[in-house]
Amino acid sequence: MSKLLNCLNEKDFSCVPVWFMRQAGRYLPEFRQIRLQNPDFLKLCFDSDLATEITLQPIKRFNLDAAIIFSDILVIPHALQQSIVFKEGLGPKCYDFNINKLLETKEKEYLSVLTPIYSAIKKTKKTLSKDKSLIAFVGAPWTLIIY
């Protein structure tokens, strides 16, 4: 079992598990190399092979105790047919919020859009050493509506 799960299950507190938020990202030269070839951030999140590779980069470099899946909280509104744009230097924006598109989104369509995210989680979990944990995340509704 991983250090993180041992601590969460109150089995072993002898060693504090280490990971940090946004551990995969622009400070890593290997990530910057991938970004040069893949300028569309959202497409990068939906490429399960690249998302898996990016997720594992900091684990290989720093031997952290947990990996955080490479994704973004805005994949959810994107899957709900909202216009999401990532602009260099400005960050993400949700343009022209459309409640009708959101309400009309069928569950099957929504899940289909998110399939690559699930695939990245499965691939990462399969590749990740058993002594490492995998952390996934999602934005709460209030956080998402702020965009």
Q: In which residue ranges do the predicted regions lie?
A:
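Conserved alpha/beta-domain cores
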Residues: 54, 135-142, 146
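Proline-centered loop/turn at the N-terminus of a beta-strand
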Residues: 131-133
